[in-house]
């Protein structure tokens, strides 16, 4: 079961492939999660670029600056591309750190999983009980469900960038839920994953 309508996610995926041919970027957000998990697809496209690539993006799209959210935005019909830049955007972890921490995955440069998890937890703590927050929460579950290799890295990131409150928020929300069928977790499977996540993250 998808979180967004298939027509929207298909358009978004096709636009992401076109974008990948035009500029260099590091993929974050829902589509990065999808490439790791093959779980829920995304509607919006979230990328990190340097200022040189931002100039190239402006040649291909109409780009606007969102001063309030510290990002740039490009749009193609109903598909939005959110663009984050070093020394400007504020997303919990410095973008200049993130832009140098990617792997190659299915033809894309994708943020490393441990950083993606931490980034998702940070964003979830802001969006909370909204539809986008719900999607963030499900994405985090999917990432843990596919096994996290570098748990030490996650704990280090949490401490280095003072994300303790955001992790507590996530764990409290995790404790409230009893299932997440959108990502294939019935009550028994959810309880087991919750126990695993708590074992990895609590008091570390």
Feature map (PLM): residue ranges:
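Compositionally biased terminal segments of proteins
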Residues: 1-204
């Amino acid at each position: 079961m998808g979180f967004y309508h298939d027509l929207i996610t298909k358009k978004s995926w096709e636009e992401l492939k076109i974008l990948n041919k035009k500029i260099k970027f590091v993929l974050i957000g829902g589509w990065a999660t999808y490439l790791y998990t093959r779980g829920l697809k995304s509607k919006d496209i979230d990328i990190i670029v340097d200022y040189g690539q931002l100039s190239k993006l402006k040649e291909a799209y109409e780009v606007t600056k969102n001063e309030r959210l510290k990002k740039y935005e490009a749009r193609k019909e109903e598909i939005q591309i959110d663009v984050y830049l070093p020394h400007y955007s504020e997303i919990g972890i410095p973008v200049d750190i993130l832009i140098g921490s990617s792997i190659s995955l299915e033809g894309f440069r994708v943020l490393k999983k441990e950083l993606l998890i931490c980034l998702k937890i940070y964003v979830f703590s802001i969006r909370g009980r909204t539809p986008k927050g719900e999607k963030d929460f499900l994405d985090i579950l999917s990432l843990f469900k596919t096994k996290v290799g570098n748990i030490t890295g996650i704990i280090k990131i949490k401490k280095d960038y003072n994300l303790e409150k955001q992790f507590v928020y996530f764990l409290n929300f995790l404790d409230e839920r009893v299932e997440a069928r959108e990502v294939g977790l019935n009550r028994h499977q959810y309880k087991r994953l919750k126990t695993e996540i708590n074992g990895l993250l609590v008091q570390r």
